[in-house]
């Protein structure tokens, strides 16, 4: 049985699947063949996850805010990255997240 202590910490993505069989091909293609990801799980019950296209180029422009980056570059960055956070629970070996932001 998985315990809370087993999952608290920082985890790197090693493989990615999909929970949407009707749209599996598009879902898996969104982040490419080598996606990168990070999951942070706190003992206080908070989590944060980020996934992006592996090897994607950095956003161009002024690194302070990138507001001067061309629209196409900003759209590519937006389309190849997702991050979310919220509360998590572990019940009967099932890890569940509640998206708050």
Predicted regions and their residues:
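Lipid interaction determinants
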Residues: 1-101
